[in-house]
């Protein structure tokens, strides 16, 4: 093996050792043991919400441990591949060396991707995520675009086996959605998805235009951490107005014969939250209250950041606006305007393959915070 490659493998070993230390591999094993004990409790499923969270965290933690252990195994096998290549002769030697080099490059990329997880150290990064998507300028195309974005995030969650809980969907008259709110139940979902917050722009030939003209549409993505009891977001009963109405589906059609949908208005701030996806009024009220608490927590965080920016003389950040462009016509490209990361196959991105964008966004945010 060439000395340069030996040095590069040593650098990979150092990087992976850092990842193992930051992720606390022994701590992961202990956490898995505890979660497996909880999951084996026959009474766990008496509380569906808790059961879902326990099984989701168990699956995520097991996957995280497997990923790190597999990286360590591959790194230990890598020098062996180069030794075997050195023993070959002629064309076989070239093929074996190419195979070893390919594994080296793949392993380096996988370790770099795992390093991203160690950058999620913000106060709320470990939380589950509450995502709201709203259609913007662009009429029916914008409503359709908002629904496409929702599908993209749901598909991403499904590919990672993260449960998704839809709280509310407000359908547009002709097609698509006006807005939707859903939770992604997975550890670090907030820290990961928070880089998606901002305006997403779509350029395509409109399927709703009988002249097949090009249309630019916008949708806004908001990502909040799910509130926990330790956040102490107490809402006096008199501060909330509760309105009930019938759930509606696409085109405004009623999907329920009772007034099960709930609208909460926080009187002091004017924040309005709706929930209509649960079967009962009580369930919708509980879900809507969770969303309202998350929005009030975010409002508190924004106020605290504004005070800090004022002390620092910082004008604040507007990076969330126009954060990504999805062009389907006249060429095909998805490009993040903050990180410059881009992919030439929008179809795969819209089908949930967004890990590259998430990793680039997390690294960008980390560099920005260090400045």
Swiss-Prot record:
The keyword Chloroplast does not apply. Gene3D superfamilies: 3.30.160.20, 3.30.70.1660, Release factor. Transmembrane segments: none annotated. The modification N5-methylglutamine is found at residue 253. One of its GO terms (cellular component) is cytoplasm. Methylated by PrmC. Methylation increases the termination efficiency of RF2. The keyword RNA-binding does not apply. Belongs to the prokaryotic/mitochondrial release factor family. This is Peptide chain release factor 2.
């Amino acid at each position: 093996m060439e000395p340069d490659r030996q040095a590069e493998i040593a650098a990979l070993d150092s990087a992976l050792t850092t990842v193992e230390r930051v992720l606390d591999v022994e701590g992961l094993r202990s956490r898995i043991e505890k979660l497996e004990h909880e999951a084996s409790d026959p009474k766990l499923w008496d509380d569906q919400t808790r059961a879902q969270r326990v099984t989701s965290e168990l699956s995520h933690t097991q996957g995280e441990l497997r990923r790190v252990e597999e990286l360590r195994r591959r790194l230990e096998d890598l020098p062996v591949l180069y030794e075997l290549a050195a023993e070959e002769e002629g064309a076989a030697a070239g093929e074996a060396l190419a195979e070893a080099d390919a594994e080296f490059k793949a392993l380096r990329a996988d370790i770099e991707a795992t390093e991203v997880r160690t950058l999620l150290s913000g106060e709320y990064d470990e939380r589950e995520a509450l995502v709201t998507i709203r259609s913007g300028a662009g009429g029916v195309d914008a409503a359709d675009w908002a629904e496409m974005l929702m599908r993209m995030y749901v598909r991403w969650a499904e590919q990672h086996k993260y449960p998704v809980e839809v709280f509310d969907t407000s359908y547009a008259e002709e097609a698509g959605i006006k807005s939707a709110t859903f939770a992604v139940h997975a550890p670090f979902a907030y820290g990961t998805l928070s880089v998606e917050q901002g305006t997403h722009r779509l350029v395509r030939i409109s399927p709703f235009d009988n002249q097949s003209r090009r249309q630019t549409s916008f949708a806004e993505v908001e990502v909040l951490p799910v509130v926990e009891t330790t956040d102490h977001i107490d809402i006096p009963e008199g501060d909330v107005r509760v309105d009930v109405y019938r759930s509606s589906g696409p085109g405004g059609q009623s999907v329920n014969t009772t007034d099960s949908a709930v609208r909460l208005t926080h009187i002091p701030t004017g924040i309005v939250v709706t929930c209509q996806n649960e079967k009962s009024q009580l369930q919708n009220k509980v879900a809507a209250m969770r969303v309202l608490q998350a929005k009030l927590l975010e409002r508190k965080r924004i106020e605290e950041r504004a005070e800090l920016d004022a002390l620092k003389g910082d004008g604040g950040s507007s990076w969330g606006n126009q954060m990504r462009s999805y062009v389907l016509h006249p060429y095909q490209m998805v490009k993040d305007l903050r990180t410059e990361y881009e992919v030439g196959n929008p179809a795969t991105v819209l089908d949930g393959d967004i890990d590259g964008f998430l990793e680039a966004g997390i690294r960008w945010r980390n560099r920005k915070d260090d400045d």
